[in-house]
Amino acid sequence: MSGASSGTATGARLFGISSVLGEYRVLIGDEGAGPSRSPSEVSFSVWYRSRAARLVILCLVASFLVPCLTFLIAETVMGQTVTTPPSLTLDHWSEVRTRAHNQGIEVRKKKWITLCEAEWVMMNVGWPREGTPPLDNTSQVEKRIFAPGPHGHPDQVPYITTWRSLATDPPSWVRPFLPPPKPPTPLPQPLSPQPSAPPTSSLYPVLPKTNPPKPPVLPPDPSSPLIDLLTEEPPPYPGGHGPPPSGLRTPAASPIASRLRERRENPAEESQALPLREGPNNRPQYWPFSASDLYNWKLHNPPFSQDPVALTNLIESILVTHQPTWDDCQQLLQALLTAEERQRVLLEARKQVPGEDGRPTQLPNVIDEAFPLTRPNWDFATPAGREHLRLYRQLLLAGLRGAARRPTNLAQVKQVVQGKEETPASFLERLKEAYRMYTPYDPEDPGQAASVILSFIYQSSPDIRNKLQRLEGLQGFTLSDLLKEAEKIYNKRETPEEREERLWQRQEERDKKRHKEMTKVLATVVTQNRNKDREE
């Protein structure tokens, strides 16, 4: 029992219980406890003598000091961090955005960081992860970004443009981080003349060094007008204009060399229109279509099914200007028409082959001779071959015009009406194109003039139609006469300002008339009232 009491006393002393009990006896006024103290003094004494209380206070102080020390250490470390151009731009991000806005582009901070620290570094063109890249590395990144096709990065254009602007026109906070400019390359010093060494004797004779002639690139062809620019020597400069020595024959020069020599000898002050140069034996030179010509014609013109008139006019100008051969015509049709369209064109062209009387013939041998479907043996250098090609090109144009005609549809012709601001001439041209496209009739045929005249009158704009219908002797007018009258009416149209002024004057006159009528009504009412008052 005594042992238990001693253990309890030891634990009580460890946690300050005995002190608490003593203080409690003092607080309640136990006898023999000495003078009484205030509650605050008693509480402080209890906390001071208790080991657990001191431990709690120590933990509270440590929990306050540790974050403070951590914050101070972090501030010290951050103050010693190396500043890089990307981080510098983030510190002045408002100025970077202003620079981008001045160029009409928009940049985002998050993507700016990703590009500068990751994507542009991974391009392997020398873009550093830290530090300022030189301008040549910036140019390499620009080449990758502006690359055509799927290899480019159009979404990164605003960012590299802004970076280029900061590098070429740097603000004050960027200049300290730019690499120093490269010193100018010194000019090479002129070499001082070396003293001439005395001639040395040699046991063997010195032979002049000669370069072996280069092998010709083109095969030898004496009849070819082309020259080998790698092996043929340039023509000599013109000397005196004296007559050539007798007995010597001037060798014939190539066409290009002679043209260059004539340009140097006789500089023309004015351009001259000269005929096409002929090759050897007065043979005309042949120039086939290039791939770029065919590509441009197909790219910049509508398909035949969409606008056959425009494509027919293009092919007509090509045939007249280039005078192509049979092979060239097939290449042209292959590039500009579909398989079904080519079939229709060739079929219509073979229908137009003239016979002996000048009218279309049905004889197969005559048709095959004039418009063959397989490659004929026509030599464009002979008059007979050129005549065959001329007839073939004419029939090809006739086939294009015949294939351009669609099934008769007069409803489509009636839908072509004159626009509000369209001139009569352009309206007539559209009307003729509709006749060619939707009817089998030729609008230029005098037998179809009456139909075209009626369509022109009734499909014109209302003001022109009303005045054309009131013309005297309308039956004797030709299409050109009606076009002149329509042009006069169109040119006498009032402008929008004149029409507005006319409507305003009409409204003003109407208001004045209404005002007068109201005045008369009021005067009548007043007079009647006065008469009633007098009678009463």
Swiss-Prot record:
UniProt subcellular location: Host cell membrane
Stored InterPro entries: G_retro_matrix, G_retro_matrix_sf, Gag_p12, Gag_P30, Retrov_capsid_N, Retroviral_Gag-Pol_poly, Retrovr_matrix
Record key words, sorted: Glycoprotein, Host cell membrane, Host membrane, Membrane, Transmembrane, Transmembrane helix
Source taxon at top rank: Viruses
Disulfide-linked positions: none
Stored Pfam families: Gag_MA, Gag_p12, Gag_p30
Bias (Low complexity): 199-209
Region spans: Disordered: 174-284, 494-536
Record flagged with keyword Membrane: yes
Biased composition (Basic and acidic residues): 494-511
GO biological process, one term: virion assembly
Extracellular compartment segments: 76-536
Annotated transmembrane regions: 55-75
A cellular-component GO term for this protein: membrane
Biased composition annotated in UniProt, kind: Pro residues: 177-198, 210-223, 233-246
Cytoplasmic topology ranges: 1-54
PTM (free text): Glycosylated by host. Cleaved by host near the middle of the molecule, releasing the c-terminal half containing capsid and nucleoprotein domains op GAG.
Record's keyword annotation contains Ligase: no
Functional description taken from the UniProt entry: Plays a role in viral particle release. Presumably acts by facilitating the fission of the virion bud at the cell surface.
Descriptive protein name: Glyco-Gag protein
